[in-house]
Amino acid sequence: MTLRQAIDLAAALLAEAGVDSARCDAEQLAAHLAGTDRGRLPLFEPPGDEFFGRYRDIVTARARRVPLQHLIGTVSFGPVVLHVGPGVFVPRPETEAILAWATAQSLPARPLIVDACTGSGALAVALAQHRANLGLKARIIGIDDSDCALDYARRNAAGTPVELVRADVTTPRLLPELDGQVDLMVSNPPYIPDAAVLEPEVAQHDPHHALFGGPDGMTVISAVVGLAGRWLRPGGLFAVEHDDTTSSSTVDLVSSTKLFVDVQARKDLAGRPRFVTAMRWGHLPLAGENGAIDPRQRRCRAKR
């Protein structure tokens, strides 16, 4: 059997299993095992039956709807390649729309950026890499309450200035020392309505804690909007991702705080409503009761 024939059979198996991107996935899995990229697969000569056995096993796992990214162990996101796997939400291409918006904004020379619900560190690490590519600096804080997600985030943030904080964004008066200090806040929080029907890759493999946002999908979004109102300085910028059914609800929520101007609904790369942006205005909120971080909110700087 040739590699081309093996890929053809794999693509047919994946299509029969309901995988939308069957051919693409079959090629990516082959490239992963070959240690090359898809474009160079025609140049690859499989060393023997052992390769085809491994390929059969990994394709069978994909046919069981194990996410492609779990099998490969990485996912591309903007300018970075992130480590992902069981226990952490796999970043989606849709979220790159927030990244594109954020990188187009005018920020101070060394801004303070917060990524709330950072998960694998996707937005935080991508923003850090973007600024590094331009020779620019920033202080970037990623926040999440999942130990497993933060393990991946630490690995992804290695060699960057990203700081990671273990904390629940729904905690009242979280991190009061950030009040009125943040220049840019982005968030891809859990936002899927609880009753939504999901693809097997999502329902069976992504952590539910990172997916579902309450009956209407707005529970964590509401908490994040509250934090943005506190943490952003006047003129600070905010972007939050939402379900494609809750764009109007998110716009109404942000607008109802009376703390933001230029509230805009925005679409993802596929043209679906996906995130809302706004600018903070008005007086700074009162400082928190104390400036200390709760010891449960452990902070760590990624190893260089």
From Swiss-Prot:
HAMAP family reported in the protein's UniProt record: RF_methyltr_PrmC (MF_02126)
InterPro entries: DNA_methylase_N6_adenine_CS, HemK-like, Methyltransf_25, N5-glutamine_MTase, PrmC_N, RF_methyltr_PrmC, SAM-dependent_MTases_sf
Family: Belongs to the protein N5-glutamine methyltransferase family. PrmC subfamily.
Single GO term (MF): protein-(glutamine-N5) methyltransferase activity
Binding site for S-adenosyl-L-methionine: 144, 188
Binding-site list for substrate: 188-191
Residue ranges the record marks as coiled coil: none
Described purpose of this protein according to its UniProt entry: Methylates the class 1 translation termination release factors RF1/PrfA and RF2/PrfB on the glutamine residue of the universally conserved GGQ motif.
Keyword terms of this UniProt record: Methyltransferase, S-adenosyl-L-methionine, Transferase
Top-rank taxon: Bacteria
Note: Was identified as a high-confidence drug target.
Record field: catalytic activity: L-glutaminyl-[peptide chain release factor] + S-adenosyl-L-methionine = N(5)-methyl-L-glutaminyl-[peptide chain release factor] + S-adenosyl-L-homocysteine + H(+)
Keyword S-adenosyl-L-methionine: yes
GO biological process assignments: methylation; translational termination
Protein name as annotated: Release factor glutamine methyltransferase
Enzyme Commission identifier(s): 2.1.1.297
